[in-house]
């Protein structure tokens, strides 16, 4: 009988919750600001975890670089807090990566909205010209 979810998936889901809470409540570095954990991928042996993050209200590349440096510097501290919060034999090594998918999704949505708006305006102008 196979399981519905692999253990690494369950650990990733729990890690996402714990790290989000830790970043919100425990990490006080001002360079990090409003950070969201969008996804977590855990290796099969649970030794490594890739944490995908986005920074809210911050599209400045320099601020994002500074935030990522701060997260990398705080990774051992975050890992120790995760170890206390979760009962794991091996607490995964945390590797933070910036998740561009949210920013790209918003950019694409804005492009579509602008195209639809200009198309409607063009049709309205054409209808007014026919009258």
Curated annotation (Swiss-Prot):
A cellular-component GO term for this protein: cytosol
Tree of life domain: Bacteria
Keywords: Cytoplasm, Ribosome biogenesis
Biological process (GO), any one: maturation of SSU-rRNA
GO-annotated molecular function: ribosomal small subunit binding
Keyword Amino-acid biosynthesis attached: no
Location of the protein in the cell: Cytoplasm
Functional description taken from the UniProt entry: One of several proteins that assist in the late maturation steps of the functional core of the 30S ribosomal subunit. Associates with free 30S ribosomal subunits (but not with 30S subunits that are part of 70S ribosomes or polysomes). Required for efficient processing of 16S rRNA. May interact with the 5'-terminal helix region of 16S rRNA.
Oligomer status and interactors: Monomer. Binds 30S ribosomal subunits, but not 50S ribosomal subunits or 70S ribosomes.
Family the UniProt entry places it in: Belongs to the RbfA family.
Name the record gives this protein: Ribosome-binding factor A
